[in-house]
Each structure stands twice: as structure tokens, then as C-alpha cells.
Swiss-Prot record:
Belongs to the M protein family. A motif (LPXTG sorting signal) lies at residues 339-343. This protein is one of the different antigenic serotypes of protein M. Protein M is closely associated with virulence of the bacterium and can render the organism resistant to phagocytosis. Residues 1-41 form the signal peptide. It is found in: Secreted, Cell wall. Residues 343-372 form a propeptide. It comes from Streptococcus pyogenes. Pfam families: Gram_pos_anchor, M, YSIRK_signal. Transmembrane segments: none annotated. GO terms for cellular component: extracellular region. This is M protein, serotype 2.2. D repeats lie at residues 275-280, 281-286, 289-294, 296-301.
Amino acid sequence: MARQQTKKNYSLRKLKTGTASVAVALTVLGAGFANQTEVRADEAKKMEVKESEKESQYKTLALRGENADLRNVNAKYLEKINAEEEKNKKLEAINKELNENYYKLQDGIDALEKEKEDLKTTLAKTTKENEISEASRKGLSRDLEASRTAKKELEAKHQKLEAENKKLTEGNQVSEASRKGLSNDLEASRAAKKELEAKYQKLETDHQALEAKHQKLEADYQVSETSRKGLSRDLEASREANKKVTSELTQAKAQLSALEESKKLSEKEKAELQAKLDAQGKALKEQLAKQTEELAKLRAEKAAGSKTPATKPANKERSGRAAQTATRPSQNKGMRSQLPSTGEAANPFFTAAAATVMVSAGMLALKRKEEN
């Protein structure tokens, strides 16, 4: 009985051991199938994530290339702005110089006008004095002519009296009283002749003085007329120079106004382009955020799929695989820190604002190129 009981117990233990072995084998076989299914799903998700990452990296490289191009365009645009500002400074300097020359010429014209007025006054005064001198000269000429006529008449009368005196003296036919009277008349005639000669000499001297004064006034008049003509020529040349400077000043002001209008127009275009590019930058940022969200969803799905087998009981091989699978999300986290989801992680310079500025510079450069 004891031996039979022992055999029975041994058989039961053997049966239990076999059953347990079969259960273990079935468990291992089921785990193998599950692991194969899980590995295939992981590989598909890995490929999808890799494709998405490759596409993001490609877009990043393309955007970096566009970034470099836009930087070059921006640099050229800045060079053009600097050149325009330098041109503006030169035009302002020319405008200032032309204004100074204009004011100097205006002062010179005013001085010449004043000198011309002074010469006109002097010329009028000289002309009036010349007219007075001419009238005096004509009056003296008339007096001199009258004096000469009177002198001739007195000489004729004196000769007549001399002849009569000589005749009376020779003939002794006249009385002493008549002789004395004739002598007195002769003496008076001689005195009148001397007085008339003195007056004649004085008139002759005055006439010569007036003639000299007249000659001097004539010379002064000629000099004044020459100066007036020269001054008129200088004034005309100054006016022509003033017109030329005024024309150059007007042209410089027109160029400066055109440059200011171009500058205002450029500012307006820049503002419009900035608004457009802000909208484009916003859309680009939204697109990047959407792609980032999709990548995050894929990573979350992958992480959830890799954590599920770790909760089932298994042997050392299965637990090792589960541990290996559990380490993958941390690796994906490291990879995620290197992916340009928003541009800041992989490349701190590549931000949405920087992309907006670069795109705006590129659009502005293209528009200016089309206008040119």
C-alpha cells in the first residue's frame, strides 16, 4: 500500500511537472509570437518616424539654404540703403554749398545795385554841373564878344579923336578950351580903353578857367559813362551767374525731393512687405507647430507600444527584451532634443522671427529687382 501510494504520488508529481513544462512551453511560444508581432509593429513605426525625421531634416536643410540666400539678399539690400544714404548726404552738402553761393551772389548783386545807384546820382549831378557850366560859358562868350565889339568901337572912336586932335593941333584952328575939352575927352577915352582892356583880360581869364572846368567835367563825364557801362556789364554777368546758381539750386532741391519721395515710398513698400511677410511667417510657424505636434503623436504612440509587453510575466530573455525596449523612449527623447521641431533646439538661430525677417528681405529685394 505504501509503495503504491508512493508510485501514485510520483506519477502525480511527474504529471504536474509535465503539465507545467507544457504550460511553460506554450507560454514561451506565445511570447515569441507576441514578440515577433511587436517587433514588426516597432519596425514599421520606426520607419515612419525615420521618414518623418528625414523629411523634417530635408526641410530644415532647405530652409537653411534659403536662410543663406536671404542673408545675401539682405546684405545687398543694406548696401543699397547705405549707398542711397551716402548719396543723400552728398546731395545735402551740394545743396548747402549752392545755398551759400546763392546768398553770396545775392549780396554781390545788392552791392552792385547800390554802386550803380550811387553812380547814377553822381552822373546826374555831373550832368547838371556841366549844363550850368555850359550856360555860364555861353554867357561869358556873349559878354566877351560884346566887350570885343565895344573895344573895337572905342578904338575906332579913339582913332577918330586922335585924328581930330592931330588935325586941330596942326591947323591951330581950335581954341584952347576946345583943345582942353578934346584932351579931356581923349584922356577919358584912354582911361575907358584901359578899363575895358582890364575887363577884357578878366573876362578872358574867366573864360579860360570855365573852359578848363568844362574840359574837366567832360572828362569826368566820359569816365563816369565808362564806369557805368562796365558796371552794367558786371551786373548783367552777376545776374546770369545768379540765374545759373538758382537753376542748379532748383535742380538739387528737385533731386533731393525725389530722393525723399523715393525714401518715403521705400518705407511704405517695406511696411507692406513686412505685413505680408509677418502673415507668411505666422503661417510658417503654424505649419512647423503642426509638424511638431504630429511628430510628438508618433513618438507617443511608439512609446505606448513599447511599454505594453513589460507588464506581462516572462523569463529572463523576455525581461531582457522588455528592458531593451523600455530604454528606447529615452533614446528617442535624446533624438527629439536634436530635431528642429520649432527651429530652436537643433539650430538656435533658426527661429520663426528670423525666418520672417529673411523672407521679408528676400521679397523686398525681388520686388526692387523687378522694378529696376
